[in-house]
Amino acid sequence: MHGLLLAAGLLSLPLHVLAHPQPSTTTSLAGRAGTVDLNEFRMAHRSSYTGNDEMMKQPSIASFRQGTYLEVATELVKQTMPNMEFRLVDDHYVGDSGIGHVRFRQTMHGIDIDNSDFNVNIGKDGKVLSHGNSFYTGPAPSSNPMVKRDFMDPMQALHGVRKALKLPIKADGATVQDMSEHKVMFKGTSGALSDPTAKLCYMAKEDGSLALTWRVETDIGDNWLLSYMDAKESAKVHNVVDYVAHATFQVYKWGLADPTEGNREILNNPWNLKTSPLTWLADGQNNFTATRGNNAIAQYNPDGGNDYENNYRPSPKNLKFEYPYSANMDPPKTYIDASVTQLFYTSNVCHDLYYMLGFTEKAGNFQVNNRGQGGKGGDYVILNAQDGSGTNNANFATPPDGQPGRMRAYIWTRANPPRDASFEAGTVIHEYTHGLSNRLCGGPANSRCLNAIESGGMGEGWGDFYATAIRLKPKDTRKTNYVKGGWVNNSPKGVRMYPYSTDMSVNPLVYTSNNKLNEVHAIGTVWCSMLYEVLWNLIDKHGKNDGPVPVFENGVPKDGKYLAMKIVMDAWPCIQPCNPNFVQARDAILDADKNLTKGANKCEIWKGFAKRGLGVGAKYDPKNRTGSNEVPKEYKYSAHME
């Protein structure tokens, strides 16, 4: 048979292949000439599952415990499938429940059998909890195809897939570029969003036989396909997998701060595959039809408890997260499906936008599966809608990287009927930003660096700043004022002392205001007021991108809004001391701009801070802060000049 192909240093499956989002629920390649029904090419179900009860009937395996969870899992596969050839897939991790998840890929003659996996789950006690198996057990090819090389070249496979599926790809004059021993890339094609690739692999067929195939990957936007073309018959496609999950979400779309700013819409596939390549409904191990995935898990939590995995969450089989909601509906539990869906949507968009701005796996972001990109996985955000542990508030708990964050969105009783915090995006964004700032200030492994009164206040201010920047509208100018929490609190004044404004007569807060403040939200209002000044200075200089994502040039956002958000985010890791004060945070923002743009915006930044008393001469003393409207000498500036 075949020797074990498992050793340290073996190449893992490419990252895009590890992405296994929910297969498309649509039946055709819409918009293509002579539409093709993809259901004809779905893979057959071949897997088996051995649960814990069944494992306990196999004492020799159930009690097996030796070494790390990877070693235990490897030994199980050896014992269960003796003499099989396989390799470790590099997407293993330990989840928040303490269960280790390990996956193996079967190989034959050193070539992957692409639909033959063995996944093992190891419990907290180090013993095998359960496993799943789809290994191929039929007859093996008598010879290594790489020796005879009696199969078509990959270019023929690309043309075969293009013709069979009627894909809008042109490959005349394209060339083949080697990527690895069994994988190539096609350069010079048109019609695809990225260069198509082809990988030689086996496919276990429904009839029990094995087929050598070219797995041709083509991203054409509405469909991102893995097409398994027979390597010997150019007109035969065995299977097709579509990475694009066609899910719909009925929500207040990104940019609407609360229900007063617009109507709900039905959005199709709202995720960004560059920042959430597994989509929002998969984690690389599992595909979900409920509000859970790699970045977040959202559910109803009426008792306010800490257990959440078995709580109710909407789970439409057709992936249509479309539920009725009106602010006049009462009681709130009657629209819990809409509430959970909205909270899940807003939090996932936060993940995707913040990822673009720098909150990645290495920086300690919130993901179950980090896909080999660094950081610690196993830490999506737990999203509790209509949490019963409180009212008239929301909060976010941020443990170190590798442990899930937790957001609690409460019912607010200041209106009749009560209002649900899930529908105020400003509240959700504010809370999610706590996770961002706590992970970045002090590093992913230390979530204790925003606990002093002034640093804690800045944590609140950063949350307000991002929520306010995101809600800016196309017609807004520096004369536009915004309140925080107006809708959910049923108050035109919102939940802060003053609106965010560049008009000192509307919002008079300055650095020395902190001398009379001893509450973090109040101090945070001072900090965000300063950042709001900087934001508009940068917008006036660079313009404002009103789209949902930034446009970069050499890693720098081209507009002032996203540039301000990027500089503020970059500043957090630059803050050297734990629990920084306003002066140190201001300097970190200047340093971040110097690193990002070579200091091209220091004038605008200095003017924004100096206008509200955090100029060159500002000094920190916890009981007697000294304010300053001075800027460096090269910038002539009057304190209240815009």
Curated annotation (Swiss-Prot):
Binding site for Zn(2+): H430, H434
Main localization of the protein described in the UniProt heading: secreted
GO biological process: one example: proteolysis
Active site as annotated: E431
Enzyme kind, highest EC tier: hydrolase
InterPro entries the record matches: FTP_domain, Fungal_virulence_M36, Peptidase_M36, Peptidase_M4/M1_CTD_sf
Family to which this protein belongs: Belongs to the peptidase M36 family.
UniProt organism field: Arthroderma gypseum (strain ATCC MYA-4604 / CBS 118893)
Glycosylated residues in this chain: N287, N595, N624
GO molecular function: metalloendopeptidase activity; zinc ion binding
Gene expressing this chain: MEP5
Signal sequence bounds: 1-19
Listed GO CC annotations: extracellular region
Protein name as annotated: Extracellular metalloproteinase 5
